[in-house]
């Protein structure tokens, strides 16, 4: 399989937010969507370079319950980005 990266992203969406599922289905290029329950799904794909998916994956921040990838670089980069965003924009107890 030419060293494909396997990626899985579990996404939760609230009541009335089915548009998230529709968006995921519409925008995915490869892979499949598994429905886990009424408000949770998993996107699964095997791609040549999962790091190229990071900008798209980031658009689901706040809804991602779990992210796994055979390329640990992708997972580490995603969570490091979250830590950087929290350091820049959040975490202050006196924030407005």
What residue ranges belong to the model's regions?
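Polybasic (Lys/Arg-rich)
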Residues: 1-96
